Structures are given as C-alpha cells and as structure tokens.
Amino acid sequence: MSRIGKKAVAIPSGVNITLDGQTVTVKGPKGQLSWTIAEEITISQEGSDLLLVARDDSKRAKSMWGLSRTLVANMVQGVTTGFEETLELVGVGYRAAMKGDALSIQLGFSHDVNVEAPAGVTFAVPKQTEIKIAGADKQAVGEIAAKIRRIRPPEPYKGKGVRYAGEKVRRKEGKKK
C-alpha cells in the first residue's frame, strides 16, 4: 500500500485538469504540462481533488502508484507557483551574464560556455556569481541546473566551481610539507 499514492492531489482554483485516457494535462497561470500515466494506474477527478488508484497489487503497480501521484502533484505545483533552482559560482574570474535568452558563463576555460534555455525554462542573473533557473517543469529545471553544475563541479581543495545555493562542499586538506 503506497502511503504517498493514497493521498489525493488538491486542485487549486485557476488550475484546469484534463483527463484523456491515461494522459493528464494540467493548465495554470505558469503554463501547461502533460504526462502519460502508467497503464497500472487509474486516475479520476472528484470535485477539487484528483485520485490515483493502483489497478492491481503487482509490484510494478505499487511502485508506479506513488510515483504517478507525486509527478501529478509536481505538475499542479509547477503551473501554480513554479520551481526555481539557484546556482552559485565560486572562484576568481568565475562569472555569468545573459546574452539574449542564452546564458554565457566564464569558468576559467579558454572560452566562454554558452547554455541555451530549454523550452519552458528561464535564466536570470541577479549577481555575476549567481544564476537563477525557473520554470513550471520540475524535471527540466533540475536537469538544466545539473548540466550547468557538471561543467565545473566544486573541487574539494579550494571549493572553486559551480554549486547549488546552500550546498556544503566537502573540503580536503592539502599536501603536508
């Protein structure tokens, strides 16, 4: 029995949900998201709640039940409030700037790194050493943040690199003489 799957997804006012077979489409003030639910899950709308139920007791149905409920809840939250990820650039000469819709980052390479924003995701640079990534799709926001961090991850000796806001970097002691 999935404890997460049993909970109903509350639908706030201003959000419109369309069920078309196994496809769920959520429309709200921040945009529109759609996702196809696994065949093992039944979805129904009762008033201002969305209920998901596993069709049988198979292991796959139980595992998809909680996942499906969480993904639908994330879609509802995404079209109402959206998701945001903040990255910090730590290091001498590490800075970011906007060039149109693209992000240009200087990370100590011989060239600038240019990152294009995927559909539905926006970049903002409030400070030269800070990048804000926002969008309605939690997966897309997290994926582009991870791709930017992967360009120059924080190194353990000086802590230089791209890190998530508030991320603690494990530091190592240098060589001893």
Curated annotation (Swiss-Prot):
<dbReference type="GO" id="GO:0002181">
    <property type="term" value="P:cytoplasmic translation"/>
</dbReference>
<dbReference type="GO" id="GO:0022625">
    <property type="term" value="C:cytosolic large ribosomal subunit"/>
</dbReference>
<keyword id="KW-0689">Ribosomal protein</keyword>
<dbReference type="InterPro" id="IPR002358">
    <property type="entry name" value="Ribosomal_uL6_CS"/>
</dbReference>
<comment type="function">
    <text>This protein binds to the 23S rRNA, and is important in its secondary structure. It is located near the subunit interface in the base of the L7/L12 stalk, and near the tRNA binding site of the peptidyltransferase center.</text>
</comment>
<dbReference type="InterPro" id="IPR000702">
    <property type="entry name" value="Ribosomal_uL6-like"/>
</dbReference>
<dbReference type="GO" id="GO:0003735">
    <property type="term" value="F:structural constituent of ribosome"/>
</dbReference>
<feature type="region of interest" description="Disordered">
    <location>
        <begin position="157"/>
        <end position="177"/>
    </location>
</feature>
<protein>
    <recommendedName>
        <fullName>Large ribosomal subunit protein uL6</fullName>
    </recommendedName>
</protein>
<dbReference type="GO" id="GO:0019843">
    <property type="term" value="F:rRNA binding"/>
</dbReference>
<dbReference type="InterPro" id="IPR019906">
    <property type="entry name" value="Ribosomal_uL6_bac-type"/>
</dbReference>
<dbReference type="Pfam" id="PF00347">
    <property type="entry name" value="Ribosomal_L6"/>
</dbReference>
<dbReference type="InterPro" id="IPR036789">
    <property type="entry name" value="Ribosomal_uL6-like_a/b-dom_sf"/>
</dbReference>
<dbReference type="InterPro" id="IPR020040">
    <property type="entry name" value="Ribosomal_uL6_a/b-dom"/>
</dbReference>
<keyword id="KW-0687">Ribonucleoprotein</keyword>
<keyword id="KW-0699">rRNA-binding</keyword>
<keyword id="KW-0694">RNA-binding</keyword>
<comment type="subunit">
    <text>Part of the 50S ribosomal subunit.</text>
</comment>
<comment type="similarity">
    <text>Belongs to the universal ribosomal protein uL6 family.</text>
</comment>
